[in-house]
Amino acid sequence: MVAAAPSNKEPLPDMMTSIRLDQSGRVEIIDQLLLPHSVVWMPVSTPEEAFDAIKTMRIRGAPAIASLAALTLRSYLSSSSSPVSSSSSSSDVISWVGQTIDYLQSSRPTAVNLGEAMDRIRAALKDSEAQNQTAGDIIQRVKKICGDVHDEDLERNMKMGRLGAEWLWKKRGGGKKGLKVMTVCNTGSLATSGYGTAIGVITALFQEDHLDTAYYAQTTPYHQGSRLTSLELTTLQIPACMICDTMLGSLFQHEDIDGVIVGADRVVKNGDTANKIGTYQAAVLAQRHNVPFMVVAPVTTIDLSLPTGAEIHIEHRPAAEATQVRGLDTETGKLSVVRITPEGVGEGDKPWQRVYNPSFDVTPAELISAVVTEKGVAERKEGEKSIDVASIC
């Protein structure tokens, strides 16, 4: 697809996408474990395959995960393999769909977008039961919600990109030709249904000629920055520079950084934000250097049921993801996995073999300057330690 420009300027080059439907309506995803060296589309036909793709990080990014789960459920309900159909009893349909969405949600509990999407289906099931709807009507209702989950994401990403770019330019654009910004992880079209969240803001700045350079962290151990964000930014021909995670402090010392822009997997009531590991350290450094720190996430990422970030469940990943690295062998031209630690690290139970590998960290609201959703921008007021994110829901 060609992304619509947020101004009257020339359209961007084609963006990558993480999910597509084939001619029969079957869901396919790019195996992101193989990026950027190999683009392989893999079919996802069943809820079990969707669960596995999410769990093994073949697809990642909270909005993209929600889209995959929803689209796979829709496709499966339309297939001959589905255990329920219009000829089933309404109770059987409600029971099976309910169990399936519980299963899909358990694949990535930190991603609130996935939970929100599944909650929409739960609410529909409850209402359908109260109205004594037929099995066929229930299935059609669920399938429509699944499609909406995917379709709504692109439109709101475009809105967030514009709002975030306008806010940061007003904050830091005075007298400057372009801004220098920094981001963590991957938040572009590969992590969403299109355009992206934090990358959407960077793209909007670029489209308005308000961007100097986008710095992006490698984001180890999974290298979402060096593998995926690098691919997206080079595809879009956006001026960018990769930095190692350990170079953040040096970057702030030696470059006039105008803003840190990140996405989120969950934003709770007081503004505390769970995002990819490494976000918290970027926020600490941003505050030390008086740099605005912006979180960009759709309303579906905001969880008002949790008062603070202390209640957010943090997923810990397998040790092998930190002790091994996948890449292209420049001699053979083939993808390979190599160990980067001594043998035994992360594999045994000795005190010297441990590996600490959380997938996310939580950035306190007091380190965040603003949260952007498709509904608006909520700024943290001077001296306060929380952000009124409910005002932009």
From Swiss-Prot:
Pathway named in the protein's UniProt entry: Amino-acid biosynthesis; L-methionine biosynthesis via salvage pathway; L-methionine from S-methyl-5-thio-alpha-D-ribose 1-phosphate: step 1/6
Primary site of residence: cytoplasm
Statement: the UniProt record of this protein carries the keyword Amino-acid biosynthesis: yes
Any one Gene Ontology BP term: L-methionine salvage from methylthioadenosine
Localization per record: Cytoplasm; Nucleus
Active site: 265 (proton donor)
Catalytic reaction(s) noted: 5-(methylsulfanyl)-alpha-D-ribose 1-phosphate = 5-(methylsulfanyl)-D-ribulose 1-phosphate
Tree of life domain: Eukaryota
Annotated site (Transition state stabilizer): 185
SUPFAM superfamilies: NagB/RpiA/CoA transferase-like
Keyword Heme in record: no
InterPro entries, per database record: IF-2B-related (IPR000649), IF-M1Pi (IPR005251), IF_2B-like_C (IPR042529), Initiation_fac_2B_a/b/d (IPR011559), M1Pi_N (IPR027363), NagB/RpiA_transferase-like (IPR037171)
Any one of the GO CC terms: nucleus
One GO MF term attached to the UniProt entry: S-methyl-5-thioribose-1-phosphate isomerase activity
A Pfam family annotated for this UniProt entry: IF-2B
Enzyme Commission identifier(s): 5.3.1.23
Keywords: Amino-acid biosynthesis, Cytoplasm, Isomerase, Methionine biosynthesis, Nucleus
Annotated PANTHER family: METHYLTHIORIBOSE-1-PHOSPHATE ISOMERASE
Purpose of the protein: Catalyzes the interconversion of methylthioribose-1-phosphate (MTR-1-P) into methylthioribulose-1-phosphate (MTRu-1-P).
Protein family (similarity comment): Belongs to the eIF-2B alpha/beta/delta subunits family. MtnA subfamily.
Protein name (database record): Methylthioribose-1-phosphate isomerase
Source organism of this protein record: Cryptococcus neoformans var. neoformans serotype D (strain B-3501A) (Filobasidiella neoformans)
